[in-house]
Amino acid sequence: AQNYPKELLDIYVIADNCTDRTAQIAASAGAFVYHRYNSHQIGKGYALDFLFKRLAEEGKDDYDGYFVFDADNYVDPDFVKEMNVTFGSGDYAALTSYRNSKNFGANWISAGYGLWFLREARFLNAPRMKLGVNCAISGTGFLVTGDVIRENGGWPFHLLTEDIEFSVNCALKGQMIGYCEKAVVYDEQPITFRQSWDQRLRWSKGFYQVDY
């Protein structure tokens, strides 16, 4: 639960090619669930684009902003409240948060990821925020304004690293991405070398796609 008026929040869950009980569990908890089945267009970017376009078609796209989370995230109770403080300035097209690790102590691999995201938060996004230059979103735990979604006609970012693709797009358009250090989201990290290798390889390919 969030320390924020619940009547001001709607929760949407995209059951993307789901074969488990995700949709039923989410619906029973009060979320609006949208089912998507597509074996060709795979990835978070396509799922987000599907939802935003459905909301526009149904006349439900008048939100001030959208938070994006992964299914395995734990969101700090003050997350929305803290993000809203920074969002209220009206200066930002998007906001990123402090992406912490849910399983930091599992082993050296998950701990390494935790240190990586600490470095990203404290030594990249925090200084950029102080200097008034663009930060970058990182996969999950971020906020995008409704104006940006409507301007883009959804979420047209489908590379393997769609978060970096979006961040670069904002920079090219002169749209600012801010950072809210007090808003914390806990993300589950890989615990095996193979999981880490596959993820890092996917990220590397995604970086190349953005550069290309």
Each predicted region: which residue ranges?
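Short acidic donor-binding/metal-coordinating loop in glycosyltransferase active sites
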Residues: 63, 71-73, 162
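Active-site donor/metal-binding and catalytic loop motifs
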Residues: 181-196
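Short, acidic, metal-binding catalytic loop of nucleotide-sugar glycosyltransferases
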Residues: 1-8
